[in-house]
Amino acid sequence: MHNHNKIANKELVVNWHITEACNYRCGYCFAKWGKQKGELIQDVASISQLMDAISGLPAVLNQMHAANFEGVRLNLVGGETFLNYRKIKEVVKQAKKRGLKLSAITNGSRINNDFINLIANNFASIGFSVDSVDNSTNLNIGRVEKNAVMNPEKIIHTIASIRAINPKIEIKVNTVVSDLNKSEDLSDFIGQVMPNKWKIFKVLPVVANHHLISEEQFTRFLRRHQRFGEIIYAEDNTEMVDSYIMIDPIGRFFQNSDFNNGYYYSRPILQVGIHQAFNEINFNANKFYSRYKRASLN
């Protein structure tokens, strides 16, 4: 099930979708599981057990792939990651106890001073999802809570506040390019934020049959922003397949191996163990590593 070619040293990035809950309703969000019961984030003992299991994952991959992963960066994603301060604080405590590095992806809308301090003092990296800075586009995408559309100025302010506490933190911007924002120019926003990385994804057909774009349209978006080529990491659909280690809210590995049939899942990690669960999904270690190359904008 796995690709066995040897790859270079790298920290292992594990994406844990801690919850499906979100205050936005983006139409092409891929973090949808039908509101499952039993999210591990709700239970302290389950969080602890999952952290133990994740700590052992580099050894599993090193054995299976003749790789040399040395540590784990636990990337917290949602849903929206920063909805419940108490629960995130518990995850931070458990992760740090085991020496795991932390990062997260957020829409930024609910980040208050408590979260700013927690992030700045405990996270190596924080990524903000920004697909558009245009109100009507964000409304069409679903980046809206009640009547409040995503506010780019709040994100700029939040990033400045986090950097003021921890100037060394890595700031990322994640952008999904779809039919709704393919013609937009985000240069002013990116120029203000000056992130360390700008990850640009082509919308996945696994979650949306509408709003899809062609390879040419995706390339045009990249070329429009080529002055940021040094920080852009672009991913088309092929590069995203089997190249992420993802855990769903109830503790199963899942993979987007086949765009036409949704996701493939392992059995729950806490039931069958990390080695067995990981064996039940596809993972391409070379693709994982090559995702970190910079996009070629020539």
Curated annotation (Swiss-Prot):
Catalytic activity reported: CTP + AH2 + S-adenosyl-L-methionine = 3'-deoxy-3',4'-didehydro-CTP + 5'-deoxyadenosine + L-methionine + A + H2O + H(+); UTP + AH2 + S-adenosyl-L-methionine = 3'-deoxy-3',4'-didehydro-UTP + 5'-deoxyadenosine + L-methionine + A + H2O + H(+)
EC code(s) of this entry: 4.2.-.-
Keywords tagged on the record: 4Fe-4S, Antiviral defense, Iron, Iron-sulfur, Lyase, Metal-binding, S-adenosyl-L-methionine
GO biological process, one term: defense response to virus
Annotated Pfam families: Fer4_12, Radical_SAM
One MF term in the entry's GO annotations: lyase activity
Record-listed [4Fe-4S] cluster binding positions: 22, 26, 29
Organism superkingdom: Bacteria
The Radical SAM core domain, residue ranges: 8-235
InterPro entries attached to this UniProt entry: Aldolase_TIM, RSAD2/Viperin_antiviral, rSAM
SS bonds (residue pairs): none
Cofactor list: [4Fe-4S] cluster
Note: How this protein allows bacteria to resist viruses that do not encode their own RNA polymerase (such as lambda, P1) is unknown.
Primary role: Expression of pVip8 in E.coli (strain MG1655) confers resistance to phages lambda, P1, SECphi8 and T7. Prevents culture collapse upon infection with T7. Catalyzes the conversion of cytidine triphosphate (CTP) to 3'-deoxy-3',4'-didehydro-CTP (ddhCTP) and uridine triphosphate (UTP) to 3'-deoxy-3',4'-didehydro-UTP (ddhUTP), probably via a SAM-dependent radical mechanism. The modified nucleotides repress transcription from T7 RNA polymerase-directed genes (possibly by acting as chain terminators), strongly suggesting these nucleotides block viral polymerase transcription.
Family under the similarity heading: Belongs to the radical SAM superfamily. Viperin family.
Protein name: S-adenosylmethionine-dependent nucleotide dehydratase
Organism this protein belongs to: Psychrobacter lutiphocae (strain DSM 21542 / CCUG 56590 / IMMIB L-1110)
